Regions:
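Radical SAM/AdoMet-radical enzyme domain recognition
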Residues: 1-3
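Short, acidic, Ser/Thr-enriched surface-loop or helix-capping motifs
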Residues: 56-57
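Short catalytic-site patches enriched in acidic/histidine residues
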Residues: 38-46
């Protein structure tokens, strides 16, 4: 995803919103996770990889998520050449148990940008984080922009549904940024 694609994605989300509103008006209550989930969420909702979920792979090893296993299995763990190639992406095995170094660093409360963000439907993908920022707990610009485009589209949907007489959850406030890093305060 590149910044110049943001407008196209925004238009696609607006088109989906129009379809959703028309379906609501016809008596249906469709769900489209990237737009409707945010209407009901009150906190961050992602996969919880490495924190509340762990992957046990066919090789008997534990991984923070399946993507790390497939990185190792396919030998692509260093595609972006950020650091020395390592085929060991596991965080333990059935014999030795789970051994996540610094597990607190995978938690939301240790992610300065994410813990104050309200793009609750963000993927916050630790595999992508590691690939693009070298840090499991810091999302890339691309992830933040996508999440905020979807968040803002969910806000637009919420306003359209309310205008049509439907209940649409707690108000999603208007913001004027797509990447929280651009408006961050010192941590």
């Amino acid at each position: 995803f590149k910044d110049d694609q943001a407008e196209d994605y925004k238009k696609a989300l607006a088109t989906l919103n129009a379809v959703l509103v028309n379906l609501y008006k016809s008596g249906k209550q469709p769900q489209l996770n990237i737009l409707t989930d945010r209407l009901q969420l009150k906190e961050m909702h992602n996969c919880g990889a490495g924190d509340s979920n762990i992957t046990l792979a066919p090789n008997g090893k534990f991984y923070l998520c399946p993507a790390f296993y497939y990185d190792e299995k396919m030998g692509i763990s260093n595609r972006l050449k950020h650091h020395k190639l390592s085929s060991e992406r596991c965080v333990g095995d059935l014999e030795a148990g789970l051994q996540i170094p610094n597990p607190q660093l995978l938690k939301l409360d240790h992610a300065p940008l994410c813990r104050i963000c309200d793009a609750y439907h963000c993927n916050r993908c630790i595999w992508l984080n590691q690939k693009l920022t070298w840090d499991n707990n810091t999302p890339s610009h691309q992830q933040c922009v996508l999440a905020h485009l979807e968040r803002n589209a969910a806000r637009d949907l919420q306003q359209q549904l309310k205008a049509a007489g439907f209940s649409a959850g707690e108000e999603i406030k208007q913001i004027d940024y797509l990447d929280p890093f651009d408006v961050r305060e010192q941590f």
